[in-house]
C-alpha cells in the first residue's frame, strides 16, 4: 500500500513557479496566465501586485544574507518596483490595443496582440494558484530542500518561526493564535537574519506556510 496523498492549494508569487516545478515527486496543477482575460489580469496586479517580502542586497552565489533596512531606501525601492509594474501595464496595454492611439481606427493595420503574450509582460508582478499533490515522501523532500532554517541560541534549527518560538517558550502544541500573537510582523528583518536556509526567500516563505 502506497503513501497517503496530501494535497495543498497554494497561492504564491509567479516568479517562483519554475522552482516549484522542479519537484518531480509532487504533481502540480497551475492556473495559467494565458487563460486569464487581459483586462482582468491588469486589474489584479493594479490592486494586488506581488511585492518582494524583503530586499536582499547584491550578493555572490545563490543566496545572500544582507538586507536593505533603511526605511527611506526601502520606500524608494518599493516605489520603483511599482513604477516598473506601471510601465509593464502601459506597454502591455499598447500591445493589446493594437496601437489605436497611433493608428487611425479605420486603418486596416490595427491588429491587437493576443492576451497570451500581453499577459507575459505582467508576470513578474503576478500571483499564481497551484494545487500541489504528493505522498509524504515527496513533501518531506520538498520541506528538506525549501524550508527555512531558523537558528536559535541553542544552536538548533527550525523549519518555521512557529516551531522556533514554541520551543523557546515551551509550548508543546502551538496553534494559529500563537502564530499571530508571537510574530505579527511577518517582515521583521531579524527573522531573515536568523534564517540560514539556502532557498530563495519567497520559496522558503511558501514552504514555511505549508509546513505550518
Give residue ranges: language-model regions.
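A conserved ligand/cofactor-binding region detector
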Residues: 1-212
